[in-house]
Regions:
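Structural signature of nuclease core domains in nucleic-acid processing machines
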Residues: 1-219
Length: 219
């Protein structure tokens, strides 16, 4: 188990990662899950599921992100156990990163899909989860922008209940949050893909760098 801590907008954040695998060049993190897994791009985009990517943004250091995964750690017995070790999540689809992540793959059979994650060396079956290296870097960095915005809103006193549609039914805090489903309209989650999320992060990063440059120039 790997501990991580970082500062976001002046706020100290810390947590623990179940597992971290790495080489001198690449790093991936894995979280073991016994319950349901929601690893959709939409959940990440809206900020409901940014924990793993936020950990990666800090733990990677100078290394290149190779993947952020949830590992289904169910103890139930099933008749068909095919794919029981298949991790769910998002990853760097560069040839070198894929080979580092699964040593059973070979350049001699580049279209063979890994048993452990949704990728092959060529023609990966799920391109929404497998990204080019730079795109995946930006995708991971998006979590920092969401955390930064959340911290800023809390500092400004914004604590209103603004749930997404369909989430109140399973919320343990429904009796105390004050959200009135009769008079208030829950937010809707719009479909988005990983490339669009990465592009948003890239533009936000460029804007932030421009702001820092202007501030330094004015000193």
């Amino acid at each position: 188990m790997e501990s991580t801590e970082t500062w976001v907008n002046g706020e100290f954040l810390n947590g623990k990662v179940d597992r971290m695998d790495g080489t001198d060049k690449y790093v991936r993190i894995v979280d073991y899950k016994t319950g349901a897994i929601d690893d959709s791009a939409v959940a990440y985009y809206t900020g409901r599921k940014i924990q793993m990517e936020l950990y990666m943004s800090e733990l990677k250091g100078e290394r290149i992100p190779a993947g952020v995964f949830y590992f289904p750690a169910s103890v139930s017995y099933k008749e068909n156990e095919e794919g029981r070790f298949r991790m769910q999540g998002f990853m760097n689809g560069s040839e070198e990163a894929v080979l580092c992540g699964d040593t059973t793959l070979s350049k001699d059979n580049p279209k063979v899909t890994s048993e452990f994650f949704p990728s092959a060396l060529k023609n990966s079956p799920n391109t929404t989860r497998v990204m080019e290296e730079e795109t995946f870097r930006d995708f991971v960095d998006y979590s920092v922008h969401v955390a930064r915005q959340g911290c800023q809103e809390l500092k400004e006193g914004f604590i209103a209940a603004t749930p997404y549609e369909g989430k109140c039914g399973s919320c343990k805090y429904g009796g105390m949050c004050g959200f009135n489903k009769e008079s208030c309209t829950p937010r809707k989650e719009n479909t988005i893909d990983t490339t669009a999320i990465a592009e948003i992060a890239r533009k936000k990063k460029e804007l932030r760098q421009m702001q820092i440059t202007v501030e330094l120039r004015d000193l």
